[in-house]
Amino acid sequence: MGGTASGPGVRSGPQSGPGPRRRRLRGFLAAAVAAGLSTHGLLPRVLRTWGATGPEKTAPLPGDELIPDADDVWTMAVTVAARPGQVWPWLVQMGVDRAGLYSYTAVENGLLRLGVTNADRIHPEWQDLKVGDIIAFTPGGYPGGRRGPRVVDLAQDRHLVLDSSPGAPPGTVTGTWQFVLHDAGPSGTRLLLRTRYGAGRPAGLRVMDFLLRPGYLVMDRAMLLGIKKRAEGGANGPPSSAPH
């Protein structure tokens, strides 16, 4: 009989490609990488100057002089329908172990387990902020202990400058958080938040900052809206819609 016999275990054609499960895994990984690149490429580009006007993005602000060679600068801004003196008390009482950070509580408590309570009123007992004080981002008992940026300059109703330089040599400022209040008409305030990073930031921290940058920006934007909501509620009655 002519021809070639074939039977169980004998392949008569070329091997097939990856199975459905492997193809799905590859597709998922490709989508995850694309989402990560998009998040780190697009989101920071959109949010790093969220709300800021052209002049506000480049205008010198109190605290800029601490890092004259900054290699990464973000400037966000929001208009608040309240006077600077009505916005200021919400700034000086910030801290996870005080009035909170006015951002997304679900992230602060559900994900990060910070135990934050974001205040909806001004606390007189937390208004005496001074140079050298820490605005806590993590509470005592948290891994690493109570940590956060340190106040290096403040002028009531005008600006609050924080040194955010973990891991830097003593006396070296490699990161700042700068809140600035500008008059915006008879009953308004422009609230600016500028974040500056210097070239001397430790390599490990630079990598962490890059990975977490989208989250930082989203939380910072929510914080500004949270301050706006609270200040407007105290000045003009019902607050606007914002995170709490």
What are the residue ranges of the model-derived segments?
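Hydrophobic alpha-helical topogenic segments used for membrane insertion/localization
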Residues: 18-45
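Short hydrophobic helices that act as membrane-entry/anchoring signals
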Residues: 30, 89-96, 209, 213-216
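Intrinsically disordered, low-complexity terminal tails and inter-domain linkers enriched
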Residues: 4-20, 239-240
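N-terminal signal-anchor transmembrane helix
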Residues: 47-73, 80-81
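Glycine-rich portal/gate segments that line the openings of hydrophobic small-molecule binding cavities
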Residues: 2-3, 67, 79, 84-85, ...
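Short amphipathic alpha-helical segments
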Residues: 83-86, 215, 219, 223
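A short acidic/glycine-rich loop-to-helix N-cap element
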Residues: 197-220
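Acidic, Ser/Thr-rich low-complexity intrinsically disordered segments
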Residues: 243-244
